[in-house]
Amino acid sequence: RRLAARTVANRIAEELKTEPGGCIGYKVRFSDHVSDNTMVKLMTDGILLAEIQQDRLLMQYDTIIIDEAHERSLNIDFLLGYLKELLPRRPDLKIIITSATIDPERFSRHFNNAPIIEVSGRTYPVEVRYRPIVEEADDTERDQLQAIFDAVDELSQESPGDILIFMSGEREIRDTADALNKLNLRHTEILPLYARLSNSEQNRVFQSHSGR
């Protein structure tokens, strides 16, 4: 979520031809790029919860957008409940809840039959290739790595595009990145991405590269 807040703020600032921290700012843990001139602030749910402790009526905001509301978490559930209770005391406050997969009718009823606005998105063709890991093998971790190696090799021969690999945790990400680096893949840079990386290390995934 911290990475998303930073990158979305940077993208909006770029679209408006301004620098982050000006009219477009963001605030995440350990990083506050907000000024007196900030009109749009992107933040994590944890930051908004912390602000509620000091500003229970959220008077510094006239509009709050809760994005990806379907990603259920204790923070999001608490915020949605709190904002519903806050609206009678802040009738001027506008709440916008966005999601691609929630039940809009149910959310509308929860917020006193709030209007529903549907925005059509762009769809892309998706091809699914199933490569099962051999279940009889004793070394499951090695089988998983070999399956990743095979998939990377297969994709490298077909398209110049980047390859995104999802892993279950930080350790698995680091181990897989180390293993891929040992392959010395041509024109390929291996970039791990997880929450504990520094901002500069996370931002490397958005930088252009001559290869993949």
Provide a role label for each language-model segment.
Residues 2-212:
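P-loop NTPase motor module signature
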